[in-house]
Amino acid sequence: MIVREALVSDPRVLPADATPQQVAELLTHPHVESALVVDGERLVGSITPETLVSAIAEGRDLGSVTAADLADGEVPTIGPDESLEEALRVMAEHDLERLAVVDGGRFLGILPREPLIRRMAADELGETDPD
């Protein structure tokens, strides 16, 4: 099985022009540890609560920045035709709960770890998809 067959194509993301207030609103939802920032179909980066704290501590004027300005552009990604085993390896290497899926610079969605593990376990045991 490959990444394309398991990805979530409509995840909750932030537009590049989102305000810090919009970023904070998303990051304060339960179970949200970070947010991906996209500009159209291009993945710009990722923002964590620590990103906002650092910006405030550095004295940045949050009234004049966007999500794209705050985003860390170093986001581990995987291509849609890679194996799910490779995706899990990348997730383990970077301690990720989800992995961004990108094809030729175009953001396609995310691959969440928990359902991926359940799906792979079911496949290994010859069971139907548990979802």
Question: Where does each model-flagged region fall?
Answer:
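Tandem CBS (Cystathionine beta-synthase) repeat/Bateman regulatory domains
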Residues: 1-131
